[in-house]
Every structure is written in C-alpha cells, then in structure tokens.
Amino acid sequence: NTIRYNRFGTTFTGGGGLKAEYDEIFSYALGAPTVTKDNLKETLIIVVPNSTDYGGITQMWADGSAIAFCPLSTYGYPLDSRGVVQHEAGGHGFGKLGDEYIYHNAFIDACGCGCCGHVDELNTAKSYGWYENLSLSGKTHGVGWSHLIYDSRYSDIVDVYEGGFMHSRGVYRSEQNSCMNNSIPYYNAISRESIVKRIKRYAGETFSFEDFVKNDKRDVGVEQSLAKAS
C-alpha cells in the first residue's frame, strides 16, 4: 500500500470505497462565498482524490448533504473520469438517484450478501425522497414513473425492467440503460424529472411537469453515447 498525506485525509477502505475527514471537508466548503450553514445541505461537494484507482463513491446524509469522491479514472468510455463525475456527483450527490447496475443474480429481499444494500436500505432512501428511479414494485401502476409509462411522449422508452440496486430480481428500473447503470451520459426520464424537481425546489420555484416535458431533451445523451461507442 502507498500512503499519501493529503488535505482531507482521503483514504481507500478495505471494501474498495473511499472515506475522509468529512467535517473538515464541510468546513472547507463553507469558505466558498455562496455556501452557508443553511444551504450546505443543498451544496454538492466533489473531492478529486490524487489517485487513478477506479472506484468513485458518494457519501450522503439524511439532510441532503453529499460529498462525491471522483478519482481520475484511466478507464475508457463510459467509465472514464467524466463518467465517474456524471454517476457519482450528478446522479448520487445531486440527483439522489440509486444505482441501477446488477452485482448479484438474486432476489433483493433474499440476498444474504454483506457488500451492498437491500430492501431496508432502499426503503430508507425512499423515506428521504431519494431513489425515485427505483421501485420494489413491478406493477406499471405501482412504480414512481407510471405517469411516464402512460404518457405517449415517453411510452416508447419508459417501462418496467427488472434488475437494479445491485440485484437482478425483486427491484425495478424504468429504462434499459442509463447513467446510474454504467455511467453513460444519459439520465433516464424519471431521473431527469427528479433532478429538475430538485433544482426547482432549491431555487424556490414550482415544478411543472408540462414545463419539464417542453424543455426535456431526451435524445441528447443517447446520441452522444452512440457517437462515443462507434
């Protein structure tokens, strides 16, 4: 192991994650001219560790505070540094979205692994108003994006797909692929809506679904992804 002394005591944990002196990071962020103790919980903080080891992680607190650790990845697209920032900072830190990728071929309510979250963790996040891109229900009227499924402007792409939050069974996502799966520059429709809702709330403005649809550009990320892959 290589020990590097750094400003915020950022270190890799045994499980492949990252940790640091969080209070010191928050204190440093308060030095920014627009950041106060009142809006710190609405402020996204990004820490770039002095490492090229792949393994970004975002620490999130119940009040909404978030610190996204985004190493300088040397992996190819879409797991490059941009992808790490899009997934960790944009997706988790600001959007409060849940992971859509799959680690285990198991039902989420029966998996006994100790390496990732399960039903309780997902429900806790839901109680905070997070993870709107995931559901434990597989019924089209029971998911949080049912309004998109039955809207002709989105029904061609939004549906109910099994698999997400690290498990292949018993948890559902809204589209086949998105940034919260493999870091491509595309957030699915419910994720985009959730992000815009948060922007509006932080700005003290009222969210309008029709305004969201009017300004939504769902093909931008898809086109960029296809161009990158070709």
Predicted regions and their residues:
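Active-site-proximal segment of zinc-dependent metalloprotease catalytic domains
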Residues: 1-104
